[in-house]
């Protein structure tokens, strides 16, 4: 198959998803669309793949990489401080452009359940979480089309068309017990999340 493959964003072709999943299983890098911007995905449990992703983007090694999930249960099993507030926040904003940084046995990890068929189907086919970082050189403008990512050294690009009208990433917040902290403001304002989180949702 070609490096750039047109992929139906509403009903992704099974053979393309299978091909992308195989590449990920072999330690490769695959660029995929989300409902916000395009991202570079790899196997989060493959250290060589993570290092290659960092090198490809020129990303600092100590900068954390978030993970995509295909269900709330995947995250619930990993989070060691899961509570009712986190669950209600997930149910309100997922799937959607919100990344939650939660504590796990492996440290603090960002999780996101995207509102886009391609990453969801790929996660399901891969059978695990996917490490994902924005498909651009570190510090550069986020990409909203496959063409904008073509200079990155990856194994496959799934072209699902324009991901959004503007290159605005997901909002990132950290939840520590019953407190939230803004890491990055994106599609959803921190004030909206803060108001919802503290509006009678605590255990």
Model-predicted regions and their roles:
Residues 1-203:
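Active-site-adjacent structural elements in enzyme catalytic cores
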